[in-house]
Protein backbone atom coordinates (compact mmCIF):
# COMPACT_ATOMS: atom_id res chain seq x y z
CA UNK A 1 0.00 0.00 0.00
CA UNK A 2 3.03 2.27 -0.07
CA UNK A 3 3.52 4.87 -2.75
CA UNK A 4 6.50 6.98 -3.87
CA UNK A 5 9.58 7.49 -1.76
CA UNK A 6 10.36 11.12 -1.06
CA UNK A 7 13.16 12.24 1.20
CA UNK A 8 12.67 15.71 2.61
CA UNK A 9 15.36 15.36 5.23
CA UNK A 10 13.39 15.09 8.46
CA UNK A 11 11.29 12.04 7.63
CA UNK A 12 11.14 9.50 4.85
CA UNK A 13 7.70 9.70 3.26
CA UNK A 14 6.75 6.31 1.90
CA UNK A 15 3.01 6.95 2.11
CA UNK A 16 2.16 9.70 -0.40
CA UNK A 17 3.51 12.47 -2.62
CA UNK A 18 2.59 16.15 -2.41
CA UNK A 19 1.65 15.75 -6.08
CA UNK A 20 -1.01 13.14 -5.25
CA UNK A 21 -4.62 14.34 -5.36
CA UNK A 22 -6.55 14.60 -2.10
CA UNK A 23 -8.95 11.95 -3.44
CA UNK A 24 -6.17 9.43 -4.20
CA UNK A 25 -4.70 9.85 -0.70
CA UNK A 26 -8.09 9.35 0.98
CA UNK A 27 -8.86 6.38 -1.27
CA UNK A 28 -5.55 4.72 -0.33
CA UNK A 29 -5.78 5.63 3.37
CA UNK A 30 -9.48 6.14 4.30
CA UNK A 31 -8.48 7.13 7.85
CA UNK A 32 -6.94 10.36 6.47
CA UNK A 33 -10.38 11.83 5.68
CA UNK A 34 -10.92 12.69 9.35
CA UNK A 35 -7.38 14.06 9.54
CA UNK A 36 -7.97 16.42 6.59
CA UNK A 37 -11.34 17.58 7.97
CA UNK A 38 -9.85 18.49 11.36
CA UNK A 39 -6.79 20.15 9.78
CA UNK A 40 -8.32 22.85 7.60
CA UNK A 41 -10.28 20.98 4.92
CA UNK A 42 -13.80 20.87 6.41
CA UNK A 43 -15.41 20.86 2.96
CA UNK A 44 -14.13 17.31 2.36
CA UNK A 45 -16.83 16.19 4.80
CA UNK A 46 -19.12 16.68 1.82
CA UNK A 47 -18.65 13.54 -0.28
CA UNK A 48 -19.46 15.47 -3.46
CA UNK A 49 -16.60 17.89 -2.78
CA UNK A 50 -14.25 14.97 -2.24
CA UNK A 51 -15.43 13.34 -5.48
CA UNK A 52 -15.07 16.52 -7.56
CA UNK A 53 -12.56 18.93 -6.05
CA UNK A 54 -10.58 16.12 -4.41
CA UNK A 55 -9.92 14.45 -7.77
CA UNK A 56 -8.50 17.59 -9.40
CA UNK A 57 -6.53 19.28 -6.63
CA UNK A 58 -3.17 17.97 -5.46
CA UNK A 59 -2.20 18.08 -1.80
CA UNK A 60 0.44 20.73 -2.57
CA UNK A 61 -2.08 22.97 -4.39
CA UNK A 62 -4.59 22.58 -1.55
CA UNK A 63 -2.01 23.50 1.09
CA UNK A 64 -0.82 26.55 -0.85
CA UNK A 65 -4.39 27.78 -1.30
CA UNK A 66 -4.81 27.56 2.49
CA UNK A 67 -1.36 29.15 3.10
CA UNK A 68 -0.36 26.03 5.07
CA UNK A 69 3.34 25.11 5.14
CA UNK A 70 3.60 21.92 2.97
CA UNK A 71 6.66 20.50 4.78
CA UNK A 72 5.10 20.86 8.24
CA UNK A 73 1.74 19.48 7.09
CA UNK A 74 3.45 16.56 5.36
CA UNK A 75 5.36 15.68 8.52
CA UNK A 76 2.17 15.86 10.59
CA UNK A 77 0.32 13.57 8.16
CA UNK A 78 3.22 11.09 8.05
CA UNK A 79 3.20 10.92 11.87
CA UNK A 80 -0.56 10.28 11.78
CA UNK A 81 -0.18 7.46 9.23
CA UNK A 82 2.75 5.91 11.09
CA UNK A 83 0.66 5.79 14.26
CA UNK A 84 -2.03 3.95 12.31
CA UNK A 85 0.62 1.58 10.99
CA UNK A 86 1.80 0.96 14.56
CA UNK A 87 -1.74 -0.14 15.39
CA UNK A 88 -1.38 -2.72 12.60
CA UNK A 89 1.93 -3.90 14.08
CA UNK A 90 0.56 -4.08 17.63
CA UNK A 91 -2.38 -6.12 16.37
CA UNK A 92 0.01 -8.54 14.63
CA UNK A 93 -1.07 -7.66 11.12
CA UNK A 94 1.10 -8.46 8.08
CA UNK A 95 3.37 -10.73 10.08
CA UNK A 96 4.52 -12.90 7.18
CA UNK A 97 4.30 -16.66 7.71
CA UNK A 98 1.91 -17.28 10.61
CA UNK A 99 1.86 -20.68 12.30
CA UNK A 100 -0.36 -22.30 14.91
CA UNK A 101 -2.29 -25.51 15.63
CA UNK A 102 -5.39 -23.62 14.49
CA UNK A 103 -4.86 -21.06 11.74
CA UNK A 104 -7.43 -18.38 10.89
CA UNK A 105 -6.93 -16.51 7.59
CA UNK A 106 -8.84 -14.16 5.35
CA UNK A 107 -9.92 -10.56 4.98
CA UNK A 108 -12.07 -8.20 7.03
CA UNK A 109 -14.16 -5.23 5.81
CA UNK A 110 -11.89 -2.15 5.90
CA UNK A 111 -14.12 0.16 8.02
CA UNK A 112 -14.40 -2.34 10.91
CA UNK A 113 -11.06 -4.14 10.57
CA UNK A 114 -9.32 -2.45 13.53
CA UNK A 115 -12.10 -2.95 16.15
CA UNK A 116 -12.51 -6.56 14.98
CA UNK A 117 -8.76 -7.21 15.20
CA UNK A 118 -8.57 -5.67 18.67
CA UNK A 119 -11.25 -8.10 19.82
CA UNK A 120 -9.63 -11.07 18.05
CA UNK A 121 -6.15 -10.32 19.45
CA UNK A 122 -7.45 -10.12 23.03
CA UNK A 123 -9.49 -13.32 22.62
CA UNK A 124 -6.61 -15.28 21.02
CA UNK A 125 -4.19 -14.24 23.79
CA UNK A 126 -6.66 -15.38 26.47
CA UNK A 127 -7.37 -18.69 24.69
CA UNK A 128 -3.69 -19.46 24.09
CA UNK A 129 -2.91 -18.93 27.77
CA UNK A 130 -5.38 -21.62 28.87
CA UNK A 131 -5.39 -24.22 26.05
CA UNK A 132 -2.89 -26.94 25.16
CA UNK A 133 -2.89 -25.87 21.50
CA UNK A 134 -2.13 -22.53 19.85
CA UNK A 135 -4.42 -20.35 17.76
CA UNK A 136 -2.87 -18.00 15.18
CA UNK A 137 -4.46 -15.57 12.75
CA UNK A 138 -3.62 -13.52 9.67
CA UNK A 139 -6.52 -11.25 8.75
CA UNK A 140 -5.82 -8.50 6.25
CA UNK A 141 -7.84 -5.57 4.98
CA UNK A 142 -10.35 -6.53 2.26
CA UNK A 143 -8.96 -3.97 -0.18
CA UNK A 144 -5.66 -5.92 -0.30
CA UNK A 145 -7.37 -8.87 -1.99
CA UNK A 146 -6.99 -12.59 -1.34
CA UNK A 147 -4.03 -13.57 -3.54
CA UNK A 148 -2.01 -14.83 -0.57
CA UNK A 149 -4.88 -17.15 0.50
CA UNK A 150 -5.62 -18.21 -3.09
CA UNK A 151 -2.02 -19.38 -3.64
CA UNK A 152 -2.38 -21.91 -0.80
CA UNK A 153 -5.80 -23.04 -2.02
CA UNK A 154 -4.45 -23.64 -5.54
CA UNK A 155 -2.07 -26.31 -4.21
CA UNK A 156 -5.01 -28.67 -3.70
CA UNK A 157 -3.46 -29.70 -0.37
CA UNK A 158 -5.88 -29.27 2.57
CA UNK A 159 -2.91 -29.21 4.98
CA UNK A 160 -1.67 -25.98 3.39
CA UNK A 161 -5.08 -24.27 3.71
CA UNK A 162 -6.07 -22.43 6.91
CA UNK A 163 -8.50 -24.08 9.34
CA UNK A 164 -10.84 -21.07 9.30
CA UNK A 165 -11.34 -18.83 6.26
CA UNK A 166 -13.07 -15.44 6.24
CA UNK A 167 -14.05 -13.47 3.14
CA UNK A 168 -16.83 -11.52 1.48
CA UNK A 169 -18.09 -12.17 -2.04
CA UNK A 170 -18.39 -15.25 -4.21
CA UNK A 171 -15.17 -15.50 -6.17
CA UNK A 172 -12.91 -17.49 -3.86
CA UNK A 173 -15.33 -19.87 -2.16
CA UNK A 174 -17.47 -20.81 -5.16
CA UNK A 175 -14.88 -21.30 -7.87
CA UNK A 176 -14.79 -25.03 -8.64
CA UNK A 177 -11.06 -24.82 -9.34
CA UNK A 178 -10.36 -23.12 -6.02
CA UNK A 179 -12.44 -23.89 -2.91
CA UNK A 180 -14.79 -26.12 -4.91
CA UNK A 181 -12.34 -29.04 -4.74
CA UNK A 182 -12.29 -28.91 -0.93
CA UNK A 183 -16.03 -28.42 -0.57
CA UNK A 184 -16.80 -31.48 -2.74
CA UNK A 185 -14.58 -33.60 -0.51
CA UNK A 186 -16.30 -32.34 2.64
CA UNK A 187 -13.13 -30.74 4.05
CA UNK A 188 -15.03 -27.66 5.27
CA UNK A 189 -18.33 -27.69 7.13
CA UNK A 190 -19.84 -24.72 8.98
CA UNK A 191 -23.42 -24.04 9.97
CA UNK A 192 -25.46 -21.42 11.82
CA UNK A 193 -28.84 -22.58 13.07
CA UNK A 194 -30.28 -19.33 14.42
CA UNK A 195 -30.54 -16.28 12.18
CA UNK A 196 -31.31 -12.59 12.72
CA UNK A 197 -34.96 -11.66 12.13
CA UNK A 198 -33.96 -9.03 9.54
CA UNK A 199 -33.21 -11.81 7.08
CA UNK A 200 -36.43 -13.72 7.72
CA UNK A 201 -38.91 -10.87 7.30
CA UNK A 202 -38.61 -11.15 3.52
CA UNK A 203 -38.18 -14.93 3.47
CA UNK A 204 -34.43 -14.71 2.90
CA UNK A 205 -32.83 -17.75 4.49
CA UNK A 206 -29.07 -17.30 4.73
CA UNK A 207 -28.61 -20.76 6.30
CA UNK A 208 -26.86 -23.11 3.89
CA UNK A 209 -29.02 -26.26 3.47
CA UNK A 210 -25.81 -28.23 2.74
CA UNK A 211 -24.32 -26.95 6.02
CA UNK A 212 -20.99 -26.10 4.37
CA UNK A 213 -20.94 -22.31 4.54
CA UNK A 214 -21.92 -19.84 7.26
CA UNK A 215 -22.69 -16.15 6.74
CA UNK A 216 -21.57 -13.88 9.57
CA UNK A 217 -22.85 -10.60 8.12
CA UNK A 218 -23.60 -8.88 4.83
CA UNK A 219 -22.50 -5.92 2.76
CA UNK A 220 -25.66 -4.17 1.56
CA UNK A 221 -25.44 -1.94 -1.54
CA UNK A 222 -27.86 0.92 -2.27
CA UNK A 223 -28.30 3.79 -4.76
CA UNK A 224 -26.57 7.14 -4.20
CA UNK A 225 -28.38 9.87 -6.15
CA UNK A 226 -26.79 13.10 -7.39
CA UNK A 227 -29.69 15.56 -7.80
CA UNK A 228 -27.83 17.91 -10.15
CA UNK A 229 -26.74 15.26 -12.64
CA UNK A 230 -30.05 13.41 -12.38
CA UNK A 231 -31.79 16.57 -13.60
CA UNK A 232 -35.50 16.19 -14.27
CA UNK A 233 -35.36 12.40 -14.45
CA UNK A 234 -37.17 10.44 -11.72
CA UNK A 235 -34.69 8.61 -9.50
CA UNK A 236 -34.82 4.80 -9.82
CA UNK A 237 -36.48 3.01 -6.92
CA UNK A 238 -35.88 -0.56 -8.08
CA UNK A 239 -33.09 -2.46 -9.84
CA UNK A 240 -35.29 -2.85 -12.91
CA UNK A 241 -35.76 0.93 -13.11
CA UNK A 242 -32.00 1.41 -12.72
CA UNK A 243 -31.41 -0.77 -15.81
CA UNK A 244 -33.78 1.27 -18.01
CA UNK A 245 -32.59 3.22 -21.08
CA UNK A 246 -33.28 6.47 -19.23
CA UNK A 247 -30.11 5.97 -17.20
CA UNK A 248 -27.79 5.11 -20.08
CA UNK A 249 -24.22 6.13 -19.22
CA UNK A 250 -25.37 7.49 -15.84
CA UNK A 251 -24.52 4.85 -13.22
CA UNK A 252 -21.23 4.40 -11.36
CA UNK A 253 -20.63 0.73 -10.59
CA UNK A 254 -18.38 -0.57 -7.75
CA UNK A 255 -15.57 -1.51 -10.16
CA UNK A 256 -12.86 -1.09 -7.51
CA UNK A 257 -14.65 -3.42 -5.08
CA UNK A 258 -14.42 -6.83 -6.73
CA UNK A 259 -16.57 -8.63 -4.15
CA UNK A 260 -19.41 -6.15 -4.50
CA UNK A 261 -19.09 -5.99 -8.29
CA UNK A 262 -19.25 -9.81 -8.47
CA UNK A 263 -22.33 -9.82 -6.24
CA UNK A 264 -23.93 -7.20 -8.49
CA UNK A 265 -23.18 -9.07 -11.71
CA UNK A 266 -24.33 -12.48 -10.49
CA UNK A 267 -27.51 -11.01 -8.94
CA UNK A 268 -28.42 -9.13 -12.13
CA UNK A 269 -27.76 -12.29 -14.17
CA UNK A 270 -29.93 -14.42 -11.90
CA UNK A 271 -32.79 -11.93 -12.14
CA UNK A 272 -32.57 -10.76 -15.77
CA UNK A 273 -30.20 -13.15 -17.59
CA UNK A 274 -27.54 -11.96 -20.05
CA UNK A 275 -29.96 -9.26 -21.22
CA UNK A 276 -29.59 -7.76 -17.74
CA UNK A 277 -25.78 -7.79 -18.08
CA UNK A 278 -26.10 -5.95 -21.42
CA UNK A 279 -28.38 -3.37 -19.78
CA UNK A 280 -25.89 -2.98 -16.93
CA UNK A 281 -23.14 -2.25 -19.49
CA UNK A 282 -25.40 0.34 -21.11
CA UNK A 283 -26.15 2.27 -17.91
CA UNK A 284 -22.53 2.06 -16.68
CA UNK A 285 -20.96 5.53 -16.74
CA UNK A 286 -18.09 5.04 -19.17
CA UNK A 287 -16.36 8.33 -18.43
CA UNK A 288 -15.14 6.82 -15.16
CA UNK A 289 -13.21 4.20 -17.16
CA UNK A 290 -10.38 5.86 -19.17
CA UNK A 291 -10.12 3.02 -21.69
CA UNK A 292 -13.74 3.52 -22.70
CA UNK A 293 -13.79 7.32 -22.54
CA UNK A 294 -13.41 7.74 -26.29
CA UNK A 295 -16.45 5.59 -27.02
CA UNK A 296 -18.59 6.98 -24.22
CA UNK A 297 -21.84 8.66 -25.23
CA UNK A 298 -22.06 10.71 -22.06
CA UNK A 299 -23.94 14.01 -21.85
CA UNK A 300 -20.86 15.50 -20.21
CA UNK A 301 -17.67 13.51 -19.68
CA UNK A 302 -16.73 15.45 -16.56
CA UNK A 303 -20.04 15.44 -14.73
CA UNK A 304 -20.52 13.22 -11.71
CA UNK A 305 -22.62 10.07 -12.22
CA UNK A 306 -26.35 10.54 -11.60
CA UNK A 307 -26.48 7.28 -9.64
CA UNK A 308 -23.76 5.33 -7.85
CA UNK A 309 -24.09 1.83 -6.42
CA UNK A 310 -22.37 2.05 -3.04
CA UNK A 311 -22.14 0.06 0.21
CA UNK A 312 -24.77 1.17 2.72
CA UNK A 313 -21.88 1.97 5.08
CA UNK A 314 -20.94 5.06 3.05
CA UNK A 315 -24.41 6.64 3.35
CA UNK A 316 -23.54 7.74 6.90
CA UNK A 317 -21.05 10.18 5.35
CA UNK A 318 -23.80 12.11 3.56
CA UNK A 319 -24.56 14.57 6.32
CA UNK A 320 -24.34 18.09 4.96
CA UNK A 321 -24.31 17.03 1.30
CA UNK A 322 -27.45 18.80 0.05
CA UNK A 323 -27.03 17.49 -3.50
CA UNK A 324 -26.71 13.82 -2.57
CA UNK A 325 -29.14 11.34 -1.04
CA UNK A 326 -29.47 7.56 -0.90
CA UNK A 327 -32.26 5.20 -1.91
CA UNK A 328 -32.68 1.72 -0.46
CA UNK A 329 -34.19 -0.09 -3.48
CA UNK A 330 -37.81 -1.18 -2.99
CA UNK A 331 -36.97 -4.65 -4.28
CA UNK A 332 -34.05 -4.92 -1.86
CA UNK A 333 -30.50 -3.72 -1.31
CA UNK A 334 -27.94 -5.85 -3.13
CA UNK A 335 -26.60 -8.43 -0.70
CA UNK A 336 -22.95 -9.52 -0.74
CA UNK A 337 -22.40 -12.13 2.01
CA UNK A 338 -19.43 -12.23 4.38
CA UNK A 339 -18.64 -15.94 4.71
CA UNK A 340 -16.84 -17.97 7.34
CA UNK A 341 -15.68 -21.54 6.66
CA UNK A 342 -14.06 -24.02 9.02
CA UNK A 343 -12.46 -27.45 8.64
CA UNK A 344 -14.60 -30.38 9.69
CA UNK A 345 -11.70 -32.41 11.12
CA UNK A 346 -10.71 -29.52 13.40
CA UNK A 347 -14.29 -29.00 14.60
CA UNK A 348 -13.45 -29.24 18.32
CA UNK A 349 -10.53 -26.82 18.08
CA UNK A 350 -12.21 -24.24 15.84
CA UNK A 351 -15.53 -24.22 17.71
CA UNK A 352 -14.36 -21.72 20.39
CA UNK A 353 -13.34 -19.23 17.68
CA UNK A 354 -16.61 -19.72 15.77
CA UNK A 355 -18.59 -19.16 18.97
CA UNK A 356 -16.60 -15.97 19.57
CA UNK A 357 -16.74 -14.63 16.01
CA UNK A 358 -20.44 -15.39 15.59
CA UNK A 359 -21.23 -13.83 18.99
CA UNK A 360 -23.43 -10.83 19.76
CA UNK A 361 -20.35 -8.72 20.59
CA UNK A 362 -18.73 -9.21 17.19
CA UNK A 363 -22.11 -8.92 15.46
CA UNK A 364 -22.58 -5.52 17.09
CA UNK A 365 -19.25 -4.33 15.66
CA UNK A 366 -20.40 -5.42 12.20
CA UNK A 367 -23.77 -3.75 12.55
CA UNK A 368 -23.09 -0.57 14.54
CA UNK A 369 -19.58 0.39 13.49
CA UNK A 370 -19.89 -0.51 9.87
CA UNK A 371 -23.54 -0.79 8.96
CA UNK A 372 -22.85 -4.36 7.85
CA UNK A 373 -26.01 -6.13 9.06
CA UNK A 374 -25.15 -9.08 11.30
CA UNK A 375 -26.78 -12.51 11.16
CA UNK A 376 -26.55 -12.95 14.94
CA UNK A 377 -30.16 -13.16 16.26
CA UNK A 378 -29.41 -10.98 19.31
CA UNK A 379 -28.00 -8.06 17.32
CA UNK A 380 -30.23 -5.06 16.61
CA UNK A 381 -29.26 -4.05 13.07
CA UNK A 382 -31.37 -0.90 13.18
CA UNK A 383 -33.09 -1.66 9.88
CA UNK A 384 -36.65 -0.60 9.08
CA UNK A 385 -39.15 -3.32 8.04
CA UNK A 386 -39.05 -2.12 4.41
CA UNK A 387 -35.24 -2.36 4.22
CA UNK A 388 -35.14 -5.76 2.60
CA UNK A 389 -32.47 -7.53 0.56
CA UNK A 390 -31.91 -8.91 -2.91
CA UNK A 391 -29.71 -11.96 -3.02
CA UNK A 392 -29.22 -14.98 -5.27
CA UNK A 393 -30.12 -17.67 -2.70
CA UNK A 394 -28.61 -21.06 -1.90
CA UNK A 395 -30.50 -22.98 -4.62
CA UNK A 396 -28.90 -20.81 -7.29
CA UNK A 397 -25.46 -21.09 -5.64
CA UNK A 398 -25.55 -24.87 -5.34
CA UNK A 399 -27.03 -25.44 -8.82
CA UNK A 400 -24.54 -23.28 -10.73
CA UNK A 401 -20.78 -23.10 -11.15
CA UNK A 402 -20.57 -19.57 -9.73
CA UNK A 403 -16.87 -19.20 -10.58
CA UNK A 404 -17.44 -19.86 -14.32
CA UNK A 405 -20.63 -17.82 -14.29
CA UNK A 406 -18.79 -14.78 -12.91
CA UNK A 407 -16.11 -15.06 -15.60
CA UNK A 408 -18.75 -15.36 -18.35
CA UNK A 409 -20.78 -12.43 -17.04
CA UNK A 410 -17.68 -10.26 -16.72
CA UNK A 411 -16.61 -11.08 -20.29
CA UNK A 412 -20.13 -10.38 -21.57
CA UNK A 413 -20.17 -7.07 -19.66
CA UNK A 414 -16.84 -5.91 -21.15
CA UNK A 415 -17.79 -7.07 -24.67
CA UNK A 416 -21.11 -5.21 -24.39
CA UNK A 417 -19.26 -2.00 -23.45
CA UNK A 418 -16.95 -2.39 -26.45
CA UNK A 419 -19.95 -2.70 -28.77
CA UNK A 420 -21.66 0.47 -27.51
Please give the residue ranges for each predicted region:
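Early extracytoplasmic/lumenal segment of secretory-pathway proteins
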Residues: 86-176
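A structural signal for short loop-to-beta-strand junctions that line the ligand-binding cleft
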Residues: 90-99, 153-156, 162-166, 190-222
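Ligand-binding pocket segment of bilobal, Venus flytrap-like solute-binding proteins
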Residues: 174, 260-329
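Short beta-strand->loop
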Residues: 185-195, 320-334, 344
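Short loop->beta-strand "edge-of-pocket" segments that line small-molecule binding or catalytic clefts
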Residues: 240-260, 268
Amino acid sequence: NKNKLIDRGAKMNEFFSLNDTLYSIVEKYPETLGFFVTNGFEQLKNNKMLETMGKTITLEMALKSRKINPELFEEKLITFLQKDEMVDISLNINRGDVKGDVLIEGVLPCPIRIPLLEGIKKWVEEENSKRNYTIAYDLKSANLGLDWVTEKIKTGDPEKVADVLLSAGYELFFDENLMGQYMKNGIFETYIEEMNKDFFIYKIDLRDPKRQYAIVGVVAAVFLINKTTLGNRKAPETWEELLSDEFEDSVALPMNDLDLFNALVVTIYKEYGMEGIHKLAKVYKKSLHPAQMVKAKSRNKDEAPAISIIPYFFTQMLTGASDLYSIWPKDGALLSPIFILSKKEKEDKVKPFLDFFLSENIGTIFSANGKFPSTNPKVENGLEPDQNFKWIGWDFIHNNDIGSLLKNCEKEFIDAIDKL
